[in-house]
Amino acid sequence: MITFDEQVAIVTGAGHGLGRSHAIALAERGARVVVNDLGGARDGTGSSSEAAEGVVAEIDAAGGEAMANGADVTDLEAVTSMVDAAIERWGRVDILINNAGILRDKSFARMDLADFAAVVNVHLRGTAVCTKAVWDQMREQNYGRIVVTTSSSGLYGNFGQANYGAAKLGVVGFMNTLRSEGAKYDIRVNALSPVAHTRMTDELLPDEAKELLKPEEVTPGVLFLVSKDAPNGVVLTAGAGGFASARIYETEGIWLPPEERTPENVAARFEEIRDPEGQEEFTGGGEQSMKFLRMAMAGMQDEN
């Protein structure tokens, strides 16, 4: 059985929706939880402590232990104070779930760059700020579990969400690097791509889907990702009780000798370039570099 006894978790954006569900479930399984929520509107404006305090009250009433925090996830000083408060009260931080986010949807033609920057700031920079605030502590204790929250908009695209999609794929790149940097300290970093009915998605989902897409149907996946036996560097997709893994593959591709390196030859052989047979999954950028060097060396030997 997966439990979190004596562990300390921070969940951002935990006043509503997915974050609330994650925080309550962690507490039910023994974790001491920092319920972080700025308490702003869906577009990130305003602030209130009411939502975070409400979730803490729910956890307390069920016999759990939690504290509310209203730090803006983009403010390093405020986030550092949040982490310090958790360590002062409970002695450590074992788990960070980066869940906070905002939406400012418009087609790119109509999108103000200020709205682009605001969304990227919360989702991508906010994830980096919160992770930075716990990173040294997790390295020192040789243990940590971190989840970043991505989205189908980042993995596959969604009309009207250029800002959100850019940020959400950005956190996957962030995860891909930290999974390597944290491995020797037993810090495991994974991504969750949820499909759920929350206030963020309320206007995007038909009514008949909302009942199936409760946040609670996603939370079992994130609890696995922050458990002691968690994987490292995976993207777990989840919604309506379904769970899958999204992965990035690169095709085997082709090598062109110098005299054939023209755009016309790339076009002529593009289907061969895209052929998925023999595709592979890399765990670091250096593996891609070595692949092309091997192809070049083999190609030159064949020419000789």
Predicted regions mapped to residue ranges:
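The beta1-alpha1 cofactor-binding region of Rossmann-like NAD(H)/NADP(H)-dependent oxidoreductases
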Residues: 49-53, 70-81, 113
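Canonical Rossmann dinucleotide-binding motif of NAD(H)/NADP(H)-dependent dehydrogenases/reductases
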Residues: 3-35
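Active-site helix of classical SDR
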Residues: 19, 131, 167
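Residue(s) in the substrate-gating loop at a strand-loop-helix junction
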Residues: 151
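Substrate-binding pocket helix/loop in short-chain dehydrogenase/reductase
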Residues: 107-108, 112-117
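A short, exposed helix-loop element centered on a Lys and neighboring polar residues
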Residues: 131-132, 176
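A glycine-rich helix->loop->beta "capping" turn
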Residues: 4-5, 62-65, 85-98, 104, ...
